[in-house]
Amino acid sequence: SFRGGKDAELVRRGETFAVLEAVTQRTRQEDQEPDDPARVRITVGTPDAQRPGRYASVNGAPPKRAAGLAGSFPAVVFDPGHLSLVKGAPEGRRRFLDAALCQLYPGYLATYRRYVRALQQKNALLRHSAGGTERPWAEKCALLEVLNVELAAQGEAIQKRRREYLALLGPLACANYAELSHGAERMAVHYAAQFEPGGLSALLKQRQNEELRAGQSLCGIHREDVELLLDDQPAKVFASQGQQRSVVLSLKMAEAAAAARITGEHPVLLLDDVLSELDEGRKQYLLTRMKEKQ
């Protein structure tokens, strides 16, 4: 199952590697000729395999960058785990945004990785400071300043993409919810930001002493959230289980519609046992919408 937390868990028990291969052909606009077919092959080796780890090829050749594979096969995955988007932690809602953006925009994954790398380095420095492993004060402040410059640059770019994407996704999701609920409640989607555009650098400077005392980073795009509201109330607090499912279904169908608008082609919808988690009305809504996209 793809639900495993580690690549090695994708490999069948008793084997040393697993292979996933697909031949894809893309047409970005209905009036355009389709692209040439591409054979994409991904291999995952266990630690004791002749070649451990994950590696990929496109038409027999490795991609120039691993990030280059992102978006090569546009797909929207919907599995039971997504049903926790409403009541789950903010991390899951950020992951929902970032996974979609990695497919839609070349370079987003590289930007995100640069942010994460700088954040890890900063947290390591802050932990050592709080734990008594002291660097000279001037050296510590200089290192933090360098890392904060990188975090501000990458964080601003990430937040900008997230805001732009939600500006498209939100109205689509709200329209879906209105159709599903027959107008019983009004859904709203907001980006809960820690800073206004252009303000991350100042925020990092403002909270630097607080972060030194806490031993961890306290601000940035890794602390932001997506607010899901029903009739202006937080869905994670007040929504029933049925309403939560409607919110998630509305978001996932909006994700597919947003991808089609941005790229000019409909993504593949991958449903993993999610129909068993939906009641008859929501199941029929999903199947009807899927038929419309064929």
Regions found by a protein language model. Give the residues of each.
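Short alpha-helix boundary/capping segments
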Residues: 88, 107-110, 239-244
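Conserved NTPase motor "head" modules and their coupling/switch loops across ABC/AAA+ ATPases, GTPases
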Residues: 16, 28-32, 135-270, 277-293
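Long, non-coiled-coil amphipathic alpha-helical linker/lever segments
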Residues: 6-7, 97, 104-162
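Nucleotide-state sensing region of NTPase/ATPase domains
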Residues: 2-92, 96-108, 170-175, 205-209
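Short, well-ordered alpha-helix to beta-strand connector turns
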Residues: 73, 293-294
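Conserved protein kinase catalytic domain
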Residues: 11, 70, 97-98, 119, ...
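Aromatic side chains
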Residues: 2, 78, 96, 108, ...
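A generic short alpha-helical patch detector that favors 3-5-residue windows
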Residues: 68, 88, 92, 114, ...
